[in-house]
């Protein structure tokens, strides 16, 4: 108050006022501060001061021909004095108003195209719904978020090339448009912006918004997709939040969401196959998301999620250096440790071999619904400050931190045996064993942890073993805070390696990610995901496996047929038959396989028993490792529709039905494609007779006597010719080969020759 009185007193003296208003600022340092560099030092003052002038704007001389000197009210719009230091005219803000009302109207067709991102935003806001405002403490954490809805995912360099090509096509400079998305966008934009009068620089700026992902590190409580971030200032303050439902989705958010779902499905599936890494790569390369190849999206999309990062690592791309455990992203902020193998005993006296981290370290832990700061020493939790949306989320974070600390009291809290397995039925590593155990039930863990008296600290409370808050007591070293912990802000990416079991390590050998860390959450993708790989057939259930397996055989029948007769071992090992095995009851799989393989061998050995439909029908069963047994089957069981259904070895069934007249195959009533049997094999099986060591010479030749039946052929000597009756009474001339030539050429040419001979 005293100061203010003193100031008022000073201001009332005219001398003070005079000094302040009339004195020139001639101190060199001040002049330097406000005049050096292009950056405006006090923009709001500059704006106010400029607008107080009569002519704050300068314009090209041509303005004098296009805008009158005075408006209807007689106010001067521009000055006859030219601007000091340039040959431009000084203009009043009133000229802008005049121009807006009376200036020429141009064609507006390009505006929605150039300013697409703005028009789209208006639409989203128009159709969005704003709900009530709630006043409550906001736990915000800084996360790296996408602030630019509706963009493609080009790199800055790729976008630059596209923009140059679209906006300045005649500029000199090498531009290489390689990726599919670059070419498509360039073509589309050139088309849209033909004869566009909007300033090229503006067009370039707006194109950049459409092509490149822009991210900022912002405090967020709630949705992090770009359509929520664009209204962040409307939906959350320091102590309030407003409910909001966006009025429309944007492709970039859909891509991010669908990519995560595809990656999770692929990692889960790869983990249970014989060679997880090879399978994962095969699936990533053969999958499309919203019509774009998944590998292209992975190269461009910066989404950080466990499954996505495993796929990136497999492709040799760099990923973030933080590591994942129990669904939380850990980032070491200080300290260091060395690893040592140690054997520990659980409360059930089971021995576990764990890799102990020796040394003091500090970490930030960031999860979907909780965040924490963890300080730990060798096998000891020093302090955990956790914050989360609700009791459940906070408990999850505490369990993960307790297990991660490797404390003895945690290991001793194990009751019962640890024998958790992953999807491939392999035992989990000890740390994940412990994690799974306590995620199921943490009661003993919390009870045994220990309790301590606490000092009251602003914004922090204690938490008891039953998860109730307390200001007096807390579980040892653990506090709940109102403030969230920021996500790791750096976008630095590191080179990593991946082993065949999909464990991702940094260059010091620390495991950053493994399939155990991939979330089991199921979601529905917003863009269509097309998995072309046979390994993903089972994602839509047993029926899809059945239909896809048979469709694959039919599509590839020509090659399958040759392999069937020449080199069945390779055929039986095809990965396309792998999913089918899960449909065959485990106990009988081996017997079925042995039975079918024997049957096929007889078909190969006995002339005239080749039967396309039967081979296709039974082939998938032969892929399992065979058990030798004398058992004969008239039908084989597959588990679909929740129960065992039968496939008849000879004849049709609801599962596998071949209609001879229409040549259509239906699986469980679903059309599985057209199956062309080889000419009339069903009646005589000539194909196998002819294939095995006979050459078809052409039409019947009477000089070689009456037509023999297929069974009589075996009596011919090498090089001898004879007429043979095939199928529907057609007769062809054949010769028994002089040498046992390759069946391959026989099987390829026989069918064609029979057809030619008959026709």
From Swiss-Prot:
Keywords in alphabetical order: Cap snatching, Eukaryotic host gene expression shutoff by virus, Eukaryotic host transcription shutoff by virus, Host gene expression shutoff by virus, Host mitochondrion, Host nucleus, Host-virus interaction, Inhibition of host innate immune response by virus, Inhibition of host MAVS by virus, Inhibition of host RLR pathway by virus, Inhibition of host RNA polymerase II by virus, mRNA capping, mRNA processing, Viral immunoevasion, Viral transcription, Virion
GO terms, biological process: 7-methylguanosine mRNA capping; cap snatching; DNA-templated transcription; symbiont-mediated suppression of host cytoplasmic pattern recognition receptor signaling pathway via inhibition of MAVS activity; symbiont-mediated suppression of host gene expression; symbiont-mediated suppression of host mRNA transcription via inhibition of RNA polymerase II activity; viral RNA genome replication
Signal peptide: none
Motif, Nuclear localization signal: chain positions: 736-739
Principal subcellular localization: virion
InterPro entries the UniProt entry points to: Flu_PB2_2nd, Flu_PB2_6th, Flu_PB2_C, Flu_PB2_CAP-bd, Flu_PB2_middle, Flu_PB2_N, INV_PB2, PB2_helical
Annotated positions for site Mammalian adaptation: 627
KW Transmembrane helix (keyword) present: no
Pfam families cross-referenced by the UniProt entry: Flu_PB2_1st, Flu_PB2_2nd, Flu_PB2_3rd, Flu_PB2_4th, Flu_PB2_5th, Flu_PB2_6th, Flu_PB2_7th
Location(s), subcellular: Virion; Host nucleus; Host mitochondrion
Gene Ontology terms for molecular function: RNA binding; RNA-directed RNA polymerase activity
Any one cellular-component term (Gene Ontology): host cell mitochondrion
Family assignment from sequence similarity: Belongs to the influenza viruses PB2 family.
Oligomer status and interactors: Influenza RNA polymerase is composed of three subunits: PB1, PB2 and PA. Interacts (via N-terminus) with PB1 (via C-terminus). Interacts with nucleoprotein NP (via N-terminus). Interacts (via N-terminus) with host MAVS (via N-terminus); this interaction inhibits host innate immune response.
Main function: Plays an essential role in transcription initiation and cap-stealing mechanism, in which cellular capped pre-mRNAs are used to generate primers for viral transcription. Recognizes and binds the 7-methylguanosine-containing cap of the target pre-RNA which is subsequently cleaved after 10-13 nucleotides by the viral protein PA. Plays a role in the initiation of the viral genome replication and modulates the activity of the ribonucleoprotein (RNP) complex.
Protein's recorded name: Polymerase basic protein 2
Organism expressing this protein natively: Influenza A virus (strain A/Kitakyushu/159/1993 H3N2)
